[in-house]
Amino acid sequence: MASRRRTLLKVIILGDSGVGKTSLMNQYVNKKFSNQYKATIGADFLTKEVQFEDRLFTLQIWDTAGQERFQSLGVAFYRGADCCVLVYDVNSMKSFDNLNNWREEFLIQASPSDPDNFPFVLLGNKVDVDGGNSRVVSEKKAKAWCASKGNIPYFETSAKEGTNVEDAFQCIVKNALKNEPEEELYVPDTVDVVGGNRAQRSSGCC
């Protein structure tokens, strides 16, 4: 039976409410942006098929609520993550100052096997707002924070204009692969019509 081997990568996006987590995800997956803000309730996710270095992956991107009342949901959603994306608004110092809290909460609730080397990526979003005149967090300050956390990759993005979104997620995929478990999805290309049995998806270790 012919089958395609496909790896599932789970990515979590964290940050304060309103920094543009949902917009970044929609821009990357659907190439769409909406000016209408709607707070995420609990958590939601989108998937995208991506090819990287001649391999096929299913990227599962989880968008979690930034409101404190939903943070207790973290354990269920964070476990099994291959990469964590931290997002702040370059026009909001508070959202930047809260990055430490989001990072620590993820490490506590996700309990990765190697927390010191778990892959994070930082995105400074909304660089397009007011032509950059409303900016309060400098690129230098953001890069210094990344350096203090083990040289976390950093991108300045605009979900509205699509600036650096594709490049950021390529980096996210690359970093997620460093944490990839030895487990893959087997997606059958054929169905056993004669026997009347639909080929089943199964997972296993390679």
Swiss-Prot record:
InterPro entries: P-loop_NTPase (IPR027417), Small_GTP-bd (IPR005225), Small_GTPase (IPR001806)
GO molecular function terms attached to this record: GTP binding; GTPase activity
Presence of the UniProt keyword Mitochondrion in the record: no
Main location, first listed in the record: membrane
Subcellular location per the Swiss-Prot or TrEMBL entry: Cell membrane
SMART domains, sorted: RAB, RAN, RAS, RHO
Membrane topology: Lipid-anchor
Binding locations of GTP: 15-22, 63-67, 125-128
Keyword Repeat in annotation: no
Lipid-acceptor residues (S-geranylgeranyl cysteine): 205-206
Pfam family, one: Ras
Superkingdom assignment: Eukaryota
GO cellular component, one term: vacuolar membrane
Disulfide bonds: none
GO process annotations (BP): protein transport
UniProt entry keywords in alphabetical sequence: Cell membrane, GTP-binding, Lipoprotein, Membrane, Nucleotide-binding, Prenylation, Protein transport, Transport
Gene3D superfamilies noted in UniProt: P-loop containing nucleotide triphosphate hydrolases (3.40.50.300)
Function (record text): Protein transport. Probably involved in vesicular traffic.
Entry similarity comment: Belongs to the small GTPase superfamily. Rab family.
NCBIfam families the UniProt entry points to: small_GTP
Protein name as it appears in the record: Ras-related protein Rab7
Originating species: Cenchrus ciliaris
